[in-house]
UniProtKB/Swiss-Prot annotation:
This is Large ribosomal subunit protein uL10. It comes from the Bacteria. It comes from Prochlorococcus marinus (strain NATL1A). Keywords: Ribonucleoprotein, Ribosomal protein, RNA-binding, rRNA-binding. Belongs to the universal ribosomal protein uL10 family. The keyword Lipid metabolism does not apply. The keyword Ribonucleoprotein applies. One of its GO terms (biological process) is translation. InterPro entries: Ribosomal_uL10, Ribosomal_uL10-like_sf, Ribosomal_uL10_bac, Ribosomal_uL10_bac_type, Ribosomal_uL10_CS_bac. Pfam families: Ribosomal_L10.
Length: 175
């Protein structure tokens, strides 16, 4: 028995809500994956604020209709698709998908969309090589800490230098 029109509308609404909260989408061919493997992928994605949604291409097409930033997905909507929607740490979510694909050897990334731009395989791999948000924040914090330390040392050096000069001058005046 097929789905009713009302249940299809609810599914489309849920997909629209997921898309509204997502920064990036990947389209995977999930043919040949077991339920256990799909559950494994979903649990890996939870850690990086991503979700894996399996839905009919026609329902996804309805969800992206009128959303300019997502219409690029339309060209990828053929075959058996799982949609990875990422709202948090894009780099670590892509890494999780790639690690999963490497382990299972069953799934393939058809493409992706980030900020309205259709991504090639190379661009998706490049995103995976980016450091995580936490690593970037650590690098920025380290750089800021370094700058403030150098400023503090520089400010402290002015009176110290003046004191050394005065001491040297007074010692040269005594002899």
């Amino acid at each position: 028995m097929g789905r009713t029109l009302e249940s299809k509308k609810q599914i489309v609404k849920k997909i629209e809500d997921l898309l509204d909260n997502s920064e990036m989408a990947l389209v995977l061919d999930y043919k040949g994956l077991s339920t256990k493997e799909m559950s494994d992928l979903r649990s890996r994605l939870q850690q990086s604020d991503g979700v894996c949604k399996v839905t009919k291409n026609t329902l996804m097409r309805q969800a992206i209709k009128g959303k300019n930033s997502w219409t690029g997905l339309d060209s990828l909507l053929t075959g058996t698709n799982a949609f990875v929607l990422i709202k948090g740490d894009v780099g670590s979510a892509v890494k999780a998908v790639q690690a999963f694909q490497k382990e299972t050897q069953k799934s393939e990334t058809k493409g992706g969309l980030f900020e309205g731009k259709l991504l090639s395989q190379d661009e998706i791999k490049a995103i995976a090589k980016l450091p995580s948000k936490e690593a970037l924040m650590g690098q920025i914090a380290g750089a800021l800490n370094s700058i403030t330390s150098k400023i503090a040392i520089g400010i402290n050096e002015v009176p110290s230098g003046l004191a050394r000069s005065l001491k040297q001058h007074s010692e040269s005046g005594e002899s």
